[in-house]
Structures are given as structure tokens and as C-alpha cells.
Amino acid sequence: MDLFDLIGPVMIGPSSSHTAGAARIGLTARLLLGEEVARAEIGLHGSFAKTYRGHGTDRALVGGLMGMQVDDPRLRDSLTLAREKGMKLIFSAVNLRGAHPNTVRMTVTGVTGRMLTIEAASVGGGNIEVHRLDGLNVVFTGKENTLIIHHTDAPGMIAAVTGLLAKEALNIANMQVYRRQAGADAMMVLELDGVPAPETLEAIRALTDIRSATFLKRRTC
């Protein structure tokens, strides 16, 4: 734990857990979707559900979905800005048994119709943990360079991806693989010491059985 975990980041207030962390969850969802958000169904669990209006969690989540950083002054007006853009927003309270009290489950739809479901928690100091993506259990924080690959579970898939990273001399600091069952949906989460070139990401996306590959650059604040 470092100082920023205790005092939180530079942000639009009032709370690092309820605003900064929420904005980061929204921004992570936007980056993973890979396009502008047209519709968001936002299910709030625990303390998020109880205090989201008073603490600005709703504005922070939506601001993140619109691509805003935690210190963007437009976060305060994000609900108005979203509606002006025609974004459809649906908020509800949900009970996610056993989840962290500051957890949100969102299903977002992009302007092309692409959909993504994400479940993530704001765990303090503006930090987040993503726990589920499109129904698959995952764990990542976004504090490191992170490559998230949605693919079909198939022999040789891990070797193909890591081989392309090795060609660029990219070191893998941490790697986890999650799957629904053998031969079904799977997710690779790789934390990297460096940043892959666009050509490397395109080569990964071109592999057979790859559904999507998204790179999240390490947070700097």
C-alpha cells in the first residue's frame, strides 16, 4: 500500500471510493467496449446503492463511461451531458451476494450495438478491482499495463499470444487465464512491463479464435 492508496488521487470529490473509483470503473468499461456508449444499465450494490446520488457515484460512473478522467471538472455535469448526447441511462439497486459493498454491475451498449457486461468494485483510495467480464470471473486492477483477451478456449492459444509478445521482447509480469469450461469462452489477463506496439495488438486480434483484445495502459495517477 502506498500514500495514494490512503489519501486517494487528485479528483472531483467528495469521496475517493464513491467518485474517483466509480469514474475509473466507468472509464474502464468504456475502454473495454472500444466505442462510445449509447446505453448503460447500471446496477448498484451495497453502499453504492444507498448513497449514489448524494456522493455523486452516478455522475462519476457516467462521466467515466463518457471517457472522463477522475479530475475532469465535467464529471459534475455528466448526467446532463450524457442525456444531451442521447445516452440512455438506467440505474437500479442489485444484490450481488458476497460482493464488496462498493460494487457495480453494468451492461453497456455501444453506438454500433456491441455489448459488454462488467462487474467491478471501488476498493478505496480511488483504486478498483474488476471481478467479472461478460460473465467470466477475472481479477485485475488497471494499475499495471494490462492486456485483456477474450477468446475461445483452444489448444495453442496461450502459446500464440505469448509468442507474439516475446517477439517484441515484452515481459509478462503476471498472467491469469479464466474459462467457462473446456472449449468455451475464455479470458486471458496479462500484466506487462511494457506497452505493445499497435502492430502486435493487431496480430493478436488476427489470431484464430480471438474475439477481442484490449490494452489498458498503466494508471499514472
Which residues fall in each region the model found?
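Generic N-terminal amphipathic, Lys/Arg-enriched alpha-helix
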Residues: D2-P14, A213
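Non-transmembrane, aqueous-exposed alpha-helical and coiled segments at domain scale
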Residues: L32-E41, P101, V108
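General beta-strand structural signal in soluble alpha/beta enzymes
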Residues: L44, I90-F91, N174, F215
